[in-house]
């Protein structure tokens, strides 16, 4: 299936270069409807989901200035035995994009790896602790700081969520001089190919700067407004931007209490032959001049990008052409000169009072350990597709 898609994309590119016109619309509809019917409606594996996803593009409405507005895009979901399935060749269905969406949601497996690493003076990356978890692609999302909220369509951005992140990454702590690294790998069901679709990292110093700023600001506000009666669990959600701004990952960050037992110093950690001390030295590109003190594999910029439309309805989505602009551009440095640009999302719940947490925070040492729990990774559909079909970068953390 993937080979057929690659061949068709190459054929369209060659034809466009020769004629300058590209393929006729009817030719494209015939091919992509055939692909959809053959690989998703007919070839159904026993363990495969019985859902079908369609990308519908509704006619654009005329704007107030008389110009035609942008077409609205919706994702429709049906069971395979539904009598309401759109007819093959329906002109309002984007069949090419529907094939891509079903491919990413149903034909691929995904493994995310979160690791605590350090960088040597020679530029090598040493992995001290890592945890891999299977995740699933979804065209919808829900807030990770509250349970039971209704999911919302996020397409064309695909989410890979870890709902039980506190359990999965329970012993993932980061300290001074370390960094948290994230890698998401896609592979087909037969394991004939695999490719990295997301890589990113954040240094402890940058993570702690954001965390301390948010907790102290929230504590000061609560001290004035609640007289210390407001209960607060000091967990903050920080976003990690991918390379070249491609998608982002979210980390749930909280302080390790002094009574907790550090995962470091165990028998496994002290063994030089342990996988915990795996050394990674392979990097595809040299560090850029701006980041000559860190491998270019990592993209530590954390300034958050903000969705363009916060009030979109559940079934509405941004068009795939907008996926690169789904968030506003941000600076490409990793030093967090302006922490206030990051949106603060605090997890409210039971625990010690906010004021007490803030006072304790000010009394603790500067380099306290932090829990760093990966909550999700999100990427635009077309960027995932490009990495799968064209790039196929080899994993580093999973190697």
From Swiss-Prot:
Residue numbers spanned by region Disordered: 254-335
Bias-annotated ranges (Polar residues): 255-264
Cystines in this chain: none
Biased composition, class Basic and acidic residues, residue ranges: 310-329
Domain of life: Eukaryota
InterPro entries referenced in this protein's UniProt entry, alphabetically: DUF2045
Protein name: Uncharacterized protein KIAA0930 homolog
Organism of origin: Xenopus laevis
């Amino acid at each position: 299936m993937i080979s057929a898609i690659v061949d068709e994309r190459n054929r369209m590119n060659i034809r466009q270069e020769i004629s300058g016109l590209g393929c006729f619309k009817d030719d494209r509809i015939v091919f992509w409807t055939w692909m959809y019917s053959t690989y998703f409606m007919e070839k159904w594996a026993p363990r495969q989901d019985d859902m079908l996803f369609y990308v519908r593009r509704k006619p654009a409405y005329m704007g107030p200035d008389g110009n035609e507005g942008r077409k609205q895009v919706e994702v429709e979901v049906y069971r395979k035995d539904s009598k309401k399935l759109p007819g093959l060749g329906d002109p309002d269905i984007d069949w090419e994009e529907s094939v891509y969406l079903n491919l990413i949601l149903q034909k691929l497996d995904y493994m995310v790896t979160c690791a605590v690493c350090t960088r040597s003076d020679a530029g090598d990356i040493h992995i001290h602790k890592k945890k891999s978890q299977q995740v699933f692609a979804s065209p919808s999302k829900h807030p990770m700081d509250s349970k039971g909220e209704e999911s919302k369509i996020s397409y064309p951005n695909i989410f890979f969520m870890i709902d039980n992140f506190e359990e999965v990454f329970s012993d993932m702590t980061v300290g001074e001089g370390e960094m948290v690294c994230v890698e998401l790998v896609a592979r087909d069901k037969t394991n004939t190919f695999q490719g990295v679709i997301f890589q990113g990292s954040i240094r402890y110093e940058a993570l702690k700067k954001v965390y301390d700023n948010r907790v102290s600001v929230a504590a000061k506000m609560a001290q004035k407004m609640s007289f210390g009666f407001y209960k607060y669990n000091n967990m903050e959600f920080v976003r990690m931007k991918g390379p070249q701004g491609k998608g982002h990952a979210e980390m749930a960050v909280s302080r390790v209490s002094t009574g907790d037992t550090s995962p470091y110093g165990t028998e496994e950690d002290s063994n030089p032959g342990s996988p915990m001390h795996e050394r990674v030295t392979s990097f595809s590109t040299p560090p850029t001049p701006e980041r000559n003190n860190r491998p270019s594999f990592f993209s530590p910029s954390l300034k958050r990008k903000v969705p363009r439309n916060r009030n979109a309805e559940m079934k509405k989505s941004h068009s795939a052409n907008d996926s690169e602009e789904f968030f506003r551009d941000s600076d490409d440095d990793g030093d967090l000169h302006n922490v206030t640009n990051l949106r603060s999302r605090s997890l409210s719940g039971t625990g010690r009072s906010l004021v007490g947490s803030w006072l304790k925070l000010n009394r603790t040492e500067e380099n306290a350990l932090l829990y760093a729990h990966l909550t999700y990774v999100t990427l635009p559909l077309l960027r995932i597709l490009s990495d799968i079909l064209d790039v196929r970068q080899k994993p580093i953390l999973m190697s």
